[in-house]
Regions:
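P-loop/Walker A NTP-binding region and its immediately flanking N-terminal helices
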Residues: 1-124
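Conserved catalytic/switch belt of AAA+ P-loop NTPases
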Residues: 111, 136-146
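Conserved binding/catalytic microenvironments
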Residues: 127
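Conserved D-loop-proximal element of ABC-family nucleotide-binding domains
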Residues: 131-133
Length: 146
């Protein structure tokens, strides 16, 4: 099972509830960094937050009481197949490092209209694998006013 298909959130439940509460009050930051050792559940946590945000106002929405994604939810199916139009996933799974061209995709992605008036989300897995040019490009994007 991959982080994008993990139905149950097994760790960071209190942190998740804090972010949900911020979202409910429209105070969720527009940039979040999850840092920690490999294998502790950061990606799973991120995908749960993404599924929560995308599944609001949809049938079979995120189950906050049990910290579970409903596998019948439309957004979950799109996210788990990496086909959600409001999600850009950048990862280094097929390469040694993340190249600057992948980071520049963020600019193209963010310039497009949002699908269903939902938030657009960029998830960079293994951000430590960016080369120096990619790091500089990301820094420039993050420094831009949003």
């Amino acid at each position: 099972m991959t982080p994008s298909t993990q139905i149950k959130l097994l760790s960071f439940k209190d942190n998740f509830k804090e972010l949900v509460n911020l979202s409910l009050r429209n105070k969720l930051p527009n940039k979040l960094i999850f840092s920690g050792n490999k294998g502790i559940g950061k990606s799973t946590f991120a995908f749960h937050l993404i599924n929560y945000l995308f599944s609001q106002d949809e049938e079979c929405s995120y189950n906050l009481e049990n910290n579970e994604i409903d596998p019948d939810n439309k957004s979950y199916k799109l996210v788990s197949n990496n086909t959600h139009p409001n999600l850009l996933l950048i990862d280094s799974t097929d390469k040694k490092f993340i190249e600057v061209s992948k980071i520049r995709e963020i600019l193209n992605f963010s310039s497009k209209t949002s699908f269903s008036n939902k938030k657009k989300i960029v998830l960079i897995n293994n951000v430590e694998k960016m080369n120096i040019n990619a790091s500089n490009a990301l820094l420039k994007i993050l420094e831009e006013p949003s």
